[in-house]
Every structure is written in structure tokens, then in C-alpha cells.
């Protein structure tokens, strides 16, 4: 398990009490809202802390508030983000992933795959990568077995797609 930092423990427990005090299991919330077939599928996709975080985030989103995921490295922030992206897709929204590190595009895509988002919801849209940095592509695998599956758009193509898009929708195919 993960130890909740002392300064966040009280607030975290109070937020979770709202669910558990009403006899609501966060796994049931995630199963329902992310449209998983069973609790076992949820448990295979996420760790317990991630399930709690996703349930709390959904609660905040439903009342028009934000949610910050700020755990230590290796706790699964990307997996939580992938879960929220799945929720967004279920709500008919377009998920947006912004990162200061271009290498995280591959990480978030791996998390999207690992939570079954590509299987259950059909095809995930082609990522609209605006970063033209050297590492901004999406890779599957590591090292010599690595294969590029998505590349960023060229700057000219990106500008053209954005300028031509006046409807508020992403360009066709994205």
C-alpha cells in the first residue's frame, strides 16, 4: 500500500468517509462511471489508491470542481489520468493530456491501453500531439524493441488544422 502524507491524511479520509459512510464502495463507482463489466476488471486495471482517487475526482467533476493528483513518482498518476480520460470519453468529452515532458506521451498511452480503454470503448482517437520535440512521439515497447506508433504533427500541419477548425471540434480523424 501507499502511505498518505500526514498533511493530506485528514482531508483524504474525510472525503472517502462521504462514500463509505453511505455504504458506497469506490470500486462500484469506478466500475459504473468508467463502464467496466466487473469489479475484478476494475481491480485488474487500477490499484486501490488509484480507484479511490478516480472516484474522488469523478465526485469533484460532477459538481464542476477540479481535482489535483499530486503523488510521489511511481504511485500511478498516469493511470489515474487514464481513468479520468476514460470517464471523459464516457461523458462525450474530449480528453486533453498536457505534459512538460514529451516522453510522458508514451507513458499515458501505455496506461490507456492497460486500463482496457482501447478494447472496451473501441478505437481511441489519434492523439493530436502539438509538441514537435524529438521525444514527443508515442512509442510502444522499450529499447531496441521500441516502435513509433504516433508522431507529432508538423508545425505547418498543426497550424493549418487549428486555423481551419472553427467549430470547436477536433479535426476529422483526431
Question: Model segments located where?
Answer:
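N-terminal pre-P-loop "Q-motif" helix
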Residues: 43-65
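Intrinsically disordered, low-structural-confidence terminal and linker regions
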Residues: 1-16
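A generic structural signal for ordered alpha-helices
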Residues: 31-35, 51, 66, 86
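SF2 helicase/translocase NTPase motor core
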Residues: 14-45, 78, 89-174
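Active-site signature of alpha/beta-hydrolase-fold catalytic machinery across serine-
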Residues: 55, 83-87
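Walker A/P-loop
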Residues: 64-84
Amino acid at each position: 500500500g501507499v502511505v498518505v502524507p500526514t498533511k493530506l491524511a485528514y482531508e483524504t479520509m474525510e472525503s472517502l468517509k462521504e462514500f463509505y459512510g453511505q455504504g458506497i464502495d469506490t470500486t462500484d463507482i469506478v466500475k459504473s462511471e468508467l463502464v467496466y463489466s466487473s469489479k475484478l476488471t476494475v481491480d485488474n486495471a487500477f490499484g486501490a489508491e488509484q480507484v479511490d482517487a478516480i472516484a474522488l475526482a469523478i465526485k469533484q467533476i460532477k459538481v464542476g470542481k477540479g481535482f489535483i493528483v499530486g503523488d510521489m513518482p511511481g504511485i500511478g498518476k498516469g493511470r489515474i489520468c487514464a481513468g479520468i480520460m476514460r470517464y471523459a470519453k464516457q461523458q462525450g468529452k474530449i480528453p486533453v493530456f498536457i505534459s512538460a515532458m514529451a516522453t510522458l506521451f508514451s507513458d499515458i498511452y501505455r496506461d490507456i491501453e492497460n486500463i482496457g480503454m482501447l478494447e472496451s470503448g473501441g478505437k481511441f482517437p489519434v492523439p493530436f500531439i502539438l509538441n514537435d520535440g524529438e521525444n514527443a512521439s508515442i512509442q510502444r515497447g522499450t529499447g531496441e524493441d521500441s516502435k513509433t506508433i504516433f508522431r507529432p504533427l508538423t508545425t505547418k500541419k498543426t497550424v493549418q488544422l487549428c486555423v481551419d477548425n472553427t467549430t470547436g471540434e477536433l479535426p476529422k480523424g483526431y
